[in-house]
């Protein structure tokens, strides 16, 4: 059996972006103290001093983990390809040993976005952004799709959904999600009059109001909002262009309201164009995946308010 490659957690000296590279869709928990359980995976990773990593759930429990989130009670939800599972830790030892399926009909390869907000569960799957109600009571009811249809399940389709500080939903759509014209926009106040390529949408909780607040990305599977309400993502490159003069590396995007990231189908505008938002940081060859802002206190201070992202390679 081949040896497990070592992976790295690196802080770039010029930014607050860290890379947690994961070669398998295994659900892992990262902490700054020694794990209490024996399934210790620290030796398979290159980690900063004082960090340890252990397996919180096996692949059989997580079901592949296309996305994950915590609810208001700290319970972990994962997408297993077609459904939402809520993992169970029966003996409270920090290791999950069971699960229950709480929502279905979210395939293929989904849900790729999950959010619990009060009594509602939002999930990216099927034909777009789905709404379930009754989460607190344990009797979830599917209320249907919010807004117009999206493509889901593919690597370039509809991705992350998160709750904004302003009480709205924010949705990241990849360049293959079915973005065109004003297909999903309902409001005349939309900062971008037309959606184009990978776009970020601002959506009312009931799904009645849709705005495109930024556009023109390649395919960022992730979206994070910092404590100031600013949106960032780690965007993909075009692998066909590697070695060519116009190759654009993976990059950290700042989704400025009304801004355009400059990607056009199979090419990109130069970053010095007045109507193109330049990257915060170019990050070379990679395969961007999940990302989140770290807003807690368990990790050392220098990691707080940092954007943690996963490299699928």
Predicted features by range, described:
Residues 13-14, 20:
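Intrinsically disordered, low-complexity proline-rich regions
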Residues 19-31:
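Bacterial N-terminal signal peptides
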Residues 36-313:
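Beta-propeller domains with acidic blade repeats across secreted/periplasmic ectodomains
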